[in-house]
């Protein structure tokens, strides 16, 4: 019992230090990226970047069914039950399948909502010009942002903390290497491509690690979707409370 407790403390300290280092790297890279972004985009470009980023955050949070949070609890409960019964990992794989299935549905839902609300968002956000097309073009970014949230939930629930740390480090560095040249060459025209690349890279890195835990797959059968209702109920509560 004492050895188990000591190992638990060692595990906590180890990953606290790891995530602290990752956070420090993220802050340093973020400062450099923001400095170059402000230099190449100017005040108006920074304003556009902020508005589009806020739109992505709001729509993805509202349309993701709360899966980035509820998915962690849903999978963790299955994993804990499997550990206690020493059974196969079928229940865990089934839980991951549900999370990925509903993440995909939520991603399509978020993209469709973004397209439909494009004119409304333009009128609500801007008092000059017509940026409806820009908001519509955010749909693929929202799609991959929601998908990435589902894969992140899988990594958290299965305890892949090292993978999460690696993903965060690589994402910060890659975003710096991609965004600065794009803003330098294209200026404000590069904002939407950079936001899309960020969302896609986040999903791709998460998927690279999560597929090692459970092979990718979705199931749109009625029985499978019904089995995911507890996931949706919990996720809906998180969305409403957030």
Language-model features and meaning:
Residues 14, 44, 48, 91-98, ...:
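Juxtamembrane loop-transmembrane helix junctions in multi-pass integral membrane proteins
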Residues 34-35, 73, 153, 238:
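Positions in alpha-helical segments
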Residues 1-29, 90-97, 210, 223-241:
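N-terminal membrane topogenesis motif
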Residues 2-10, 41-45, 59-101, 156-163:
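Transmembrane-helix boundary and interhelical linker motifs in polytopic inner-membrane proteins
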Residues 23-26, 32-33, 46, 50-79, ...:
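Small-residue-rich midsections of specific transmembrane alpha-helices
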């Amino acid at each position: 019992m004492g050895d188990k407790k000591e190992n638990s403390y060692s595990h906590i300290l180890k990953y606290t230090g790891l995530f602290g280092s990752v956070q420090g790297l993220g802050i340093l890279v973020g400062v450099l990226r923001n400095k170059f972004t402000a230099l190449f985009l100017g005040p108006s470009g920074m304003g556009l970047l902020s508005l589009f980023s806020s739109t992505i955050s709001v729509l993805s949070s509202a349309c993701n069914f709360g899966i980035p949070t509820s998915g962690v609890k849903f999978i963790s409960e299955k994993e804990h039950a499997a550990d206690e019964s020493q059974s196969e990992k079928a229940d865990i794989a089934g839980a991951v399948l549900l999370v990925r299935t509903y993440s995909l549905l939520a991603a399509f839902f978020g993209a469709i909502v973004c397209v439909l609300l494009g004119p409304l968002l333009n009128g609500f956000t801007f008092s000059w010009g017509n940026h409806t097309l820009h908001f519509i073009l955010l749909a693929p970014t929202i799609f991959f942002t929601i998908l990435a949230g589902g894969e992140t939930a899988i990594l958290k629930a299965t305890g892949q903390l090292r993978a999460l740390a690696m993903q965060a480090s690589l994402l910060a560095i890659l975003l710096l290497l991609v965004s600065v040249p794009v803003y330098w060459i294209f200026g404000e025209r590069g904002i939407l491509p950079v936001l899309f690349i960020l969302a896609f890279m986040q999903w791709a890195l998460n998927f690279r690690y999560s597929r090692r835990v459970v092979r990718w797959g979705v199931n749109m059968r009625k029985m499978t979707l019904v089995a995911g209702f507890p996931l949706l109920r919990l996720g809906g509560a998180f969305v409403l409370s957030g």
